[in-house]
Amino acid sequence: MKFSPLVDELIQSLRCLPGVGPKSAQRMAFALLESDRKAGIRLADTLSRAMSDVGHCQKCRTFTEQSLCPICSSSRRGEADTLCVVETPADVLAIESGGHFQGRYFVLQGHLSPLDGIGPEELGLSLLEGQLVGGGISELILATNPTVEGDATAHYIADIARRAGVAVSRIAHGVPVGGELEYVDSTTLALSFNGRLPL
């Protein structure tokens, strides 16, 4: 069934979000139009402001409305000598929620993928190399995803770090806490065995 052109456009617009199919988009559109128009107006206003005002931190490339994000502008963390490289701003939030890392970040906004036209320049690797060569960084922690592209990206960046004389490490991969071995895939299990630690 076709709705009014504007309702159809709203449904199609909502489908641009990851994981939102036609039915989910229709439910969202109807919820906003039927029951909570104030929330819909607030959503539209916030979305409009975010799209025009949110950019990238000049130092780490995460999302921010300022020239520097809160971590890079922090007097305590902005000068930390440990730098963690991640693929997305969501990865920063995941690590921050653990509360264990107190260094700075560098957000690639993706991973190397030559077939998709994503090379070193698209990931800001010249900016990263400048920070490593410029001094002040003693350790680089690579926290890219454990995928073929994530591994290739980590190896590429590790070479840059070594040339700059910066110690480089990669986060461990393996069996999740609370996980049962029978449900762990063979690749993860192999990584766990290869990365085992003495007790």
UniProtKB/Swiss-Prot annotation:
Annotated GO biological process: DNA recombination; DNA repair
Assigned keywords, A-Z: DNA damage, DNA recombination, DNA repair, Metal-binding, Zinc, Zinc-finger
Gene3D superfamilies to which the protein is assigned, alphabetical: 3.40.1360.10, 6.10.250.240, RecR Domain 1
Any Pfam family matching the protein: Toprim_4
Chain ranges of zinc fingers (C4-type): 57-72
GO molecular function, one term: DNA binding
Superkingdom of the source species: Bacteria
CDD domains: TOPRIM_recR (cd01025)
Residue ranges constituting the Toprim domain according to the UniProt record: 81-176
Membrane-spanning residues: none
Family: Belongs to the RecR family.
Function: May play a role in DNA repair. It seems to be involved in an RecBC-independent recombinational process of DNA repair. It may act with RecF and RecO.
Name of this protein: Recombination protein RecR
Lineage: Bacteria, Pseudomonadati, Pseudomonadota, Gammaproteobacteria, Alteromonadales
Gene: recR
